[in-house]
């Protein structure tokens, strides 16, 4: 069976915003995998920072050695190809593989003039890689879904919705 690989590098950062979303999804997914036989792995860039996760029973943690910018562009794609894995990017991940689904939380840097020029350019390249490679894109609201379709030219039928944060409003 083809493994499913989640990029967990953001779980080395403080657990707020997008890392919080990834944390919540991974910790809730782990017990649901019991008895399914699915091979789910969480890969992360092992640069000495701790991974902020409780012990997982059904998701295998895979540290990958890499320098900062080579992880997403070289090391992780190589790992995915070598293991013929399906990639699940929960944190607006840049990717270079066709067997993938990505959550693109928002495209704020492309629609608002609040970020530095280089960051906006880098984010644009990032979004183009998602458009070119992701089999399916998910986002967090209907408005973002429409914006992603309009600005990036991704057909609406390739963009799904995954709402986040509802449990924090209770």
Predicted segment positions?
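Carbohydrate transferase catalytic cores enriched for Leloir-type hexosyltransferases
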Residues: 1-170
């Amino acid at each position: 069976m083809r493994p499913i690989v989640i990029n967990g590098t953001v779980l080395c950062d403080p657990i707020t915003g997008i890392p919080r979303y990834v944390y919540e999804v991974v910790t809730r997914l782990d017990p649901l995998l019991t008895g399914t036989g699915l091979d789910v792995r969480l890969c992360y860039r092992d640069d000495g920072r701790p991974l902020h996760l409780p012990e997982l029973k059904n998701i295998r943690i895979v540290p990958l050695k890499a320098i900062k910018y080579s992880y997403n562009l070289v090391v992780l794609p190589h790992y995915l190809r070598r293991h013929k894995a399906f990639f699940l990017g929960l944190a607006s991940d840049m990717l270079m593989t066709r067997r993938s689904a990505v959550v693109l939380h928002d495209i704020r840097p492309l629609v608002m003039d609040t970020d530095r020029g280089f960051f906006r350019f880098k984010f644009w390249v990032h979004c183009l890689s998602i458009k070119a490679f992701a089999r399916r894109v998910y986002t967090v609201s209907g408005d973002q879904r429409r914006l992603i379709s309009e600005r990036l030219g991704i057909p609406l039928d390739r963009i799904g919705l995954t709402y986040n944060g509802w449990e924090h409003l209770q």
